[in-house]
Amino acid sequence: AFVDMELPLPEGECMLAPRVEARLLQALQVQKTDKVLEIGAGSGYMAALLAHRAQRVISLEIKPALAQLARANLQKASITNAEVREADGAKDVSVDGPFDVIVLSGSVAEVPQVLLAQLKPGGRLAAIVGNEPMMRATFVTRTGETGYTTTQPWDTVAPRLSNFPEPSRFN
C-alpha cells in the first residue's frame, strides 16, 4: 500500500509525496527514446518510474548515503537503464547533456539557467518552484535555441534541494 505523504529518508531528507511524483511524471509525457536527468535521487523511486518510460536516466544525488540507497533500490528492482551518480545537481549537470527531460525531485527558489541550457529543443523540465508556503509545479519546454514556454498548473510544497541558490532578500 502507498501512503500519500513525504516519506522520510536518511540524512534528514524526505521523498516527494507519491501524488506529486505521479503528477510530475504524467505531465512530462516521458517517451521510450528520452534521455532523462533527475536532480535529487533520494530513494531512487522517481528514477525507477522514469526508467520504466525512458531510454536512459541519470540521477544525481549530493548525499553519499542516499546515492548508495538509490543504487541499491534500483539494483533490487533489476533496473538497468538508470544510473545514480554522487554529484551536486546545482553544479555538475553538463556531463551527458543535452537531455530530453529534466526532473528536479525537490523544490528550488527558481529554475537555474544552467539546467535550462541542458534541455534539447523540445525538451521538458519539471520543478517545484517558490518559497513556502507558496510553491508551484513548474513545467518548462524549450521551444528553440533561446525560447522557452513555462506553465505553473498547480500549487504544492516540497522539501528544498541542497545547494541551489536562494533569491536575495532585502533586510
Which ranges hold each PLM region?
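Conserved AdoMet
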Residues: 1-29
